[in-house]
Amino acid sequence: TEVASVVLAGLSGGAGKSVAAVALLAALRQDGYAVSPFKKGPDYIDAGWMARAAGRPCYNLDPFLMSPQQILATFREHLAGSDLALIEGNRGLYDGVNATGSYSTAELAILLNLPVLLVVNCAKTTRTVAALVLGCRHFDPRVRIAGVILNQIATPRHERIIRESLAQTTDLPVLGIIPRLKTDIFPMRHLGVTPHQEYADADQAIERLATLAKEHFDLKAITAAMQPVLPVEPPAPSKISSVTDRLKIGVLRDAAFQFYYEENLEALQGQGAELVMIDALHADKLPDDLHGLYIGGGFPETSAQELANNHSFRRSLIRYIENDLPVYAECGGLIYLGRSILLEGTEYPLAGVFPVTFSLDRKPQAHGYSQFTVEGVNTFYAKGLQLK
């Protein structure tokens, strides 16, 4: 059965794509649709909210990190059992890593041959919205913009002028609006939305967004604008070794450690490993029969007090590592293996595997893609290999 699919894009970061995406997913789910969510780029946080709203895993589609063949396979293999699919873009529609827009949301929409819903932040503007939408429509004729969602609409008059301006200059329909809200439905932080695992009222926020979409979106027209896509069956996993049938791998997954790609977890399971989810904030100790431990990224700094207070779990972790338990830790997970973390003058003890104290600045220093070439012989990567 074909799955109707669409890309949700914006004119820039902060346009309201995440609000629109979660609102759409939640409303369509309440209406009985099974919707597969996808997030363009390496983002974990938006993907987490989308997964929670849709009630099913959200998969990342990243043109920088993945080949076109991998993107097509990941997308089509994860459509099975769905009625609809929604891909949230990132940044502006044509924004990429260079002046030609390489790896942009537009490129992804072209690759997948999907229409685009354009979310526009209309704060303090009216007719200029039509000029921006018209520019996006004609900038690349391969990009099929199917309609517009107007965000930050202040009054009925504000909405009317923008609708009339769009009708006079384009044939693109307005498929929904998001009124200007007095308070953020999502709690915000330095990288955008706060992870849903850290927000006690996440389900209420999603419920509010579902109500908003039902009141202000033309859900019937949105689903009609989607492009049917035929799912494909994923290939049967080829197990590396019969030994993996007996492997049990612990995964720290809680409010502190949440940054995992579903594909990576599924790859481990596909090789026969059993994954055991562990809450480092509340568990007394690691399970006794683990063969390995995976600690992903996240924000251990926001849970520093809880991590520090869980003395028994930290002692258990150190004991297992001293007894040669293999551990893969990255980003926030690697920080957790340090001696301590310094936050605003207060030092919080961590696992203490490495004699290192981490400190965090108030503002992010930088983030983005990096590319490396392996220059020396080592255990993990072939010399000359390109790493992203």
Predicted regions and their residues:
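Beta-strand->loop->alpha-helix junctions that form or flank phosphate-binding loops
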Residues: 39-40, 173-182, 274-282
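C-terminal and late-domain segments of enzyme folds
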Residues: 109, 215, 243-245, 257-269, ...
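A short helix->loop->beta-strand "cap" motif at the edges of active sites that frequently abuts
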Residues: 114, 172, 322-326
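Internal gly/pro-rich beta-alpha loop/helix module
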Residues: 126-241
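Phosphate-binding active sites in nucleotide-utilizing proteins
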Residues: 245-310, 315-320
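Cysteine-nucleophile active-site neighborhood
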Residues: 300-380
